[in-house]
């Protein structure tokens, strides 16, 4: 898909209703675009960073979409206040959905300033542009369970205090406070959902779930072809996570942006609310490993302790495939 300049986008859309979505090349943004095309009649404009090349793999489902012509791309940069001002002023979107961010907890320690600029200051740029040029625009910013940090009780709810323990979590928690300030001070429809882990086929391979599923697929292929394979290397397999389906989450986000339609208890005098979105169930990474291999028809078992623990192919499957390497998963301390 071509990235259009803002003037061309304005000329194409004219007076149509618009939803502006950032982070559209990622998992959540691409699912959001597809959801909106399927469920609304809005023109969808996606914001992408000014790069000579960008990843379009998550757009493959849109190639033959009957409403693909109602999805356009234009340049966007969270750290460029003038760019954001122009977009909000010229397009006057009805909704502004922000998934753009520095999203990696580990990287936030090495790039704390950049993380803050993207995840907090960038949100201020958007809110200020909306306040000045399009105050009826509804704004959603993606939050994270990392905002909770050191939790006080389980399960966490909307009233749980925010005690982030990483620069990433702190940047998202600060953004939440900024969103609240603008909502209450300027009467904006501005919210930040608090999202737990949500997965899917568009999840980046740097996340543990995709690392596991891609690894399982690679190992299965190697077993069938009788070729050697590298074990999947993981950190603490006893860590628990709350995982959900990313497609369910974009539906929840749309409902948060339209509470008068979806809240039975809603009336015009009520404050809009921010919500935690989760499955309310936790599972260990170990369980995820077992289920992923089971889905691929590979049986295995755990043995060893601590960093010496391994998940190896079962005797029955070893006889079936006669693998060169029997260790499917091993622990690497660097991933703790």
Where are these regions (language model features)?
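N-terminal Rossmann-like NAD(P)+-binding domain of SDR-like oxidoreductases, especially those catalyzing
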Residues: 1-198, 247, 253-257, 286, ...
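Alpha-helix boundary/capping detector
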Residues: 113-114, 122, 165, 208, ...
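Heptad-repeat alpha-helical coiled-coil signaling segments
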Residues: 197, 201-204, 238-241
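A glycine/serine/threonine-rich, flexible loop-to-helix segment
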Residues: 154, 205-213
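C-terminal substrate-binding subdomain of Rossmann-fold SDR/epimerase-dehydratase oxidoreductases
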Residues: 13, 39-41, 46-47, 76-77, ...
């Amino acid at each position: 898909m071509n990235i259009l300049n803002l003037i061309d986008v304005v000329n194409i859309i004219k007076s149509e209703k618009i939803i502006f979505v950032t982070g559209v090349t990622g998992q959540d943004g691409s699912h959001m675009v597809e959801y909106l095309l399927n469920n609304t009649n809005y023109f969808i404009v996606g914001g992408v960073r000014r790069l000579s090349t960008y990843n379009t793999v998550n757009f493959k489902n849109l190639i033959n979409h009957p409403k693909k012509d109602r999805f356009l791309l234009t340049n966007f940069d969270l750290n460029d206040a003038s760019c954001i001002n122009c977009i909000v002023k010229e397009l006057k979107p009805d909704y502004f959905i922000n998934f753009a961010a520095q999203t990696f907890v580990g990287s936030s320690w090495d790039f704390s300033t950049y993380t803050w600029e993207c995840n907090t200051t960038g949100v201020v740029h958007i809110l200020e542009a909306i306040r000045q040029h399009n105050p009826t625009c509804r704004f959603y910013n993606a939050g994270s369970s990392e905002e909770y940090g050191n939790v006080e009780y389980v399960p966490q709810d909307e009233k749980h205090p925010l005690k982030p323990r990483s620069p990433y979590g702190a940047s998202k928690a600060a953004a939440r406070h900024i969103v609240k300030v603008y909502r209450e001070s300027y009467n904006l429809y501005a919210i930040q959902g608090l999202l737990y882990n949500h997965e899917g086929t568009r999840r980046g391979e740097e996340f543990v779930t995709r690392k596991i599923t891609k690894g399982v697929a690679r190992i299965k292929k190697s077993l069938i072809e009788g070729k050697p394979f590298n074990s999947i290397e993981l950190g603490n397999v006893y860590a628990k996570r709350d995982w959900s389906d990313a497609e369910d989450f974009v539906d929840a986000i749309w409902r948060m942006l339209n509470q008068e339609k979806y809240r039975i208890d809603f009336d015009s005098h009520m404050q809009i609310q921010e919500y935690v979105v989760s499955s309310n169930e936790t599972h260990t990474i170990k369980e995820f490993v077992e289920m992923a291999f089971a889905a691929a028809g590979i049986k295995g078992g755990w043995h060893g302790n601590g960093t010496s623990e391994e998940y190896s192919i079962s005797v029955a499957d070893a006889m079936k495939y006669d693998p060169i390497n029997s260790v499917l998963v091993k622990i690497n301390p660097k991933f703790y």
